[in-house]
Structure formats: structure tokens, C-alpha cells
A protein has these predicted regions:
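Inter-helical loop and helix-membrane interface segments of multi-pass membrane transporters/permeases
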Residues: 62-70, 112-124, 146-169, 178-230, ...
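Hydrophobic mid-bilayer segments of alpha-helices in multi-pass membrane transport proteins
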Residues: 103-105, 130-135, 172, 219-227, ...
Length: 480
């Protein structure tokens, strides 16, 4: 009888190991000391933090907002661009990073279509520029440019990364963390505009702001969510970020921050009739494949502008992705001994390919989202996190009003918490050496106040090399 029990126990252990090995066969979940449950929670956290892009992206690209007949098409293109890009991250790069049309870049595309560049570019023209920028980014990621110290071939893009000073690379995660937190504070109306000082803390003493749905109510929703996340994280509760977002969403209902009209289909451009959105998208008249059909018929005399815009799109996408990947991967400890993210080349190929796919579908540059840090902070370490995000974006196309119902103030609590977690990387910066501390500080502060990861990196590198050349020149002995 004892032998029978032993065989049953051993058999159970064997089956358990077999089952675990199957679940790990592709994503290597146990290798990174994670679990399927953790990865699912992480994917949900990332999605909830970035779901706002579904409505914000069409509004940024189309100046007419929901009144523009192309709004539904751009919404579908936004979701599909996010799905394709994030699936590439899941299956090619196998990293817990999510992609979607990037903020800032979509506003640039909107200004191009709106005529702000001095030429009247069509929607197809703008998508063609984005498409070519994606091709340039892809070429930079695959063209070989020498070998590293291990004899492995490296790409031109990797050479650019290797040429980045260490002080700047160490500053990127800190800057991105503060940048994410700053976005969260703004989305929550905790930080508001001021015509004299540009920014200020929301005035909690102003009774007008306490009206139902007012700025103080939004701030309270985010602060409440942050407190919930912090307390649950202190006790190592899995899914603390998601619970915090959902709890603050519930609080937002009586405070009037959440718009209940969204759920009943009373908001223009947001409907439960998903087939109407798909019909508009697949008609082909609004966005899809316009980059090919009408994209390369540029206005006369706009060649130089087109070249500059294309290079700008490619460089912003590349440096934004580099910065986001370094920040998120360093926070998740998914970096090699040289401080580079694991599967770095595949991450870049995934990003550039997603940009090309997005342009063909009719949306602006698809890039790796800093909100991926929300999933990383929830424990996401593998491509399964990205897969969950992609699935949720797929579902969102059919349940758009439900996801649009989550107020930005509720998601802001997660962004602020991510900023707290990424701030710990500041201890890696050598502040004893001014040659490192000054460029590091400029990188961080310019990234936040300049509202651009790329500008922060660029300013930091510029200051570093100016100081480097100046100090070398000053330290040279005078020859007689």
C-alpha cells in the first residue's frame, strides 16, 4: 500500500512538473521567478494604465475630435496598432512591454494634417511619412555595424546606444519615472496650469473645485488609489495596482469624476454598436492603406519638410523606445551585465515593425509605452504580460465604452506609484563627480519639464560632451 501511495505522489509531482514545463516552454516564466497569475495581473495593470490612448489618440490626430467622420476608423486603427505591436513584444522580443500610438508623436501628426507645417498634407501624406520613418528605424536596427567585445555583431542602433555616456544611461530610468509620475499628477488634476508659474498644486481651498466632478474630486480619486496601492504593496498583495485602479474607479462614481453617460451610449463617438466602427474602418475611405493609395502625392515644394519630418519621427521613436526599455527593464532587472535590456535588438525590431503596421492601418507612430512600467511594478517579467495586454486591446474594440469609463484620474494613481518605484535608481548615479552629476540632473529635469524623453536625453548628452571637452582642455598642461 505504501508503494502505491508513493507512486501516486511521485506521479502527481511528475504531472505537476510536466504541466509547469509546458506553461514555461515559450515564455520561461519560472526562469524569471514569476507566475502565470502574476503575469496576468501585470498585463491588466499595464492595459488599465494605457487604455486612455484609445480615445486620446483619435482626438490628437483629428482636430475635429468625435465630430470627425474618421474618428471611429482611427479608434480601430489605434487598437489594432497596439495589438500588433504588443504581440510582437510578446512573441518576438518576449518582454513585458506594451506598444501603442505614442503621445506627442500623434499630436505632431495631427499638426501635419492640420496644416501647421506650412503645407496642406493629406491624411495619407502623414501616414506615408510615418511609414518611411518606421522603415528607417528598422534599417538602423538590423544593419550590422561592427562587433561587440564578445565578438557578436551589433547593429547601427546598438552602436548609437553604446556611444551614450554611462551617466546618461543611469539617469534615464529616474527621468522616465518622474516623467510617468508627472503625467499621472496632471491626469489626476493634482498638478494644474498657472498663468504666472506655469504649474501649481490644485487649490484645495477653492470651493468651486469641490463641485461634483471638479478638479479636487479628481485629485482625491487619484490620491485614494495611490494610498490603496501603497498599503497593499506594503503587505505584498498581488495585483495591488489593479485593485487600486478599480477601487478609485468605484470612488469616482459618487464624486462625479466617472462619466456614467459613457456606459449608456450617450457620448458622441463612443458606442456599443462595435460593427459600426468596423464598417467605417474597413471601408478603406478613411484611414486604412491611405499611406499607399494617397500617401506619396506630396504638396509641391515640400520635399525638405518631408525629409526633416521623417528623420524626426524616426529619431524620436528610436530614442523614446531606447529610454523606455532601459527604464522599465532595469526596474524589472531584465538587463545584461552591460546594462542593456535583454533581447534588445528584437525589442527594436518589434517597435519599428509596429510603426510600419500602424501607418498602413492609419495611425501615428506606434512605440513602446512608458506605462509598461505599471505592469513591471506589478511583477511582469515575460512576454506573457504583453500577450495579456494585446488580448485586452482586442477585447476593448468590442467593449470600448466599458474601458473608456475608467477615468484618467483612477489610472493616474498607478502612474504615480510607478514613478516612486523607478526613483530608486537614482542611487546608481555618481553625484560626487560633477562631470556625471550635472549631465544626469539635466537629463532628468529636461525630460520631465520638457515633457519629452528624447529632449531630456539629447540635452544630457550635449551637456556631457561640452563638459567633457572643456575639462579635458582645462586639465591639459600648459606648454612653453
Amino acid at each position: 500500500l505504501g508503494d502505491v501511495y508513493k507512486r501516486q505522489i511521485l506521479g502527481g509531482v511528475f504531472l505537476k512538473k510536466t504541466k509547469r514545463s509546458k506553461s514555461d516552454s515559450f515564455f520561461n516564466i519560472s526562469k524569471y521567478k514569476s507566475s502565470v497569475k502574476t503575469e496576468i495581473f501585470a498585463g491588466l495593470a499595464t492595459f488599465l494604465a494605457m487604455a486612455y490612448i484609445l480615445t486620446v489618440n483619435p482626438n490628437n490626430i483629428l482636430w475635429g475630435g468625435t465630430s470627425d467622420p474618421r474618428f471611429a476608423s482611427v479608434f480601430i486603427a489605434t487598437a489594432l496598432g497596439a495589438i500588433i505591436g504588443t504581440l510582437l513584444m510578446a512573441f518576438l522580443a518576449k518582454m513585458p512591454l506594451a506598444q501603442a500610438p505614442g503621445m506627442g508623436l500623434n499630436a505632431m501628426v495631427g499638426s501635419i494634417i492640420g496644416g501647421a507645417m506650412g503645407f496642406t498634407f493629406s491624411y495619407g501624406n502623414a501616414m506615408a511619412l510615418v511609414l518611411v520613418s518606421g522603415i528607417i528605424f528598422l534599417l538602423l536596427s538590423i544593419i550590422p555595424c561592427g562587433k561587440d567585445k564578445y565578438g557578436k555583431k551589433v547593429s547601427l542602433r546598438e552602436k548609437i546606444f553604446d556611444g551614450m555616456p554611462k551617466a546618461i544611461r543611469l539617469s534615464i530610468p529616474v527621468g522616465i519615472g518622474l516623467f510617468i509620475a508627472f503625467i499621472g499628477l496632471q491626469n489626476a488634476s493634482i498638478i494644474v496650469d498657472n498663468k504666472f508659474t506655469l504649474l501649481q498644486l490644485v487649490d484645495f481651498n477653492n470651493p468651486e473645485f469641490w463641485a461634483k466632478g471638479g478638479t479636487c474630486c479628481s485629485a482625491i480619486v487619484a490620491i485614494f488609489g495611490l494610498i490603496v496601492i501603497t498599503i497593499l504593496s506594503h503587505y505584498n498583495v498581488k495585483g495591488s495596482v489593479i485593485i487600486g485602479i478599480l477601487a478609485s474607479t468605484v470612488l469616482s462614481i459618487p464624486l462625479g469624476v466617472a462619466n456614467l453617460d459613457i456606459l449608456v451610449g450617450k457620448v458622441d463617438g463612443i458606442s456599443w454598436k462595435f460593427w459600426e466602427n468596423f464598417q467605417a474602418f474597413f471601408s478603406g475611405d478613411n484611414t486604412v492603406f491611405l499611406s499607399f493609395v494617397k500617401g506619396f502625392d506630396f504638396p509641391e515644394g515640400s520635399l525638405l519638410t518631408c525629409i526633416m519630418l521623417t528623420i524626426t519621427f524616426a529619431m524620436i521613436d528610436m530614442f523614446d523606445t531606447m529610454g523606455t526599455c532601459v527604464g522599465c527593464c532595469q526596474n524589472a532587472k531584465l538587463i545584461d551585465e552591460d546594462g542593456k535590456p535583454l533581447n534588445y535588438d528584437k525589442i527594436m525590431i518589434s517597435d519599428s515593425t509596429a510603426t510600419m503596421a500602424g501607418a498602413m492601418l492609419g495611425t501615428s507612430t506606434v512605440t513602446t509605452f512608458v506605462e509598461s512600467g505599471a505592469g513591471v511594478s506589478a511583477g511582469g517579467k515575460t512576454g506573457l504580460t504583453a500577450l495579456v495586454v494585446a488580448i485586452l486591446f482586442l477585447v476593448s474594440m468590442f467593449l470600448f465604452p466599458l474601458f473608456a469609463f475608467i477615468p484618467s484620474a483612477a489610472a493616474a494613481s498607478a502612474l504615480i506609484y510607478v514613478g516612486v518605484l523607478m526613483m530608486k535608481n537614482v542611487v546608481n548615479i555618481d553625484f560626487e563627480n560633477v562631470k556625471n552629476s550635472v549631465p544626469s540632473f539635466i537629463t532628468i529635469i529636461a525630460m520631465v519639464l520638457g515633457y519629452s524623453i528624447t529632449d531630456g536625453i539629447g540635452m544630457g548628452i550635449l551637456i556631457f560632451f561640452i563638459l567633457d571637452l572643456s575639462l579635458i582642455h582645462i586639465s591639459e598642461p600648459t606648454r612653453h
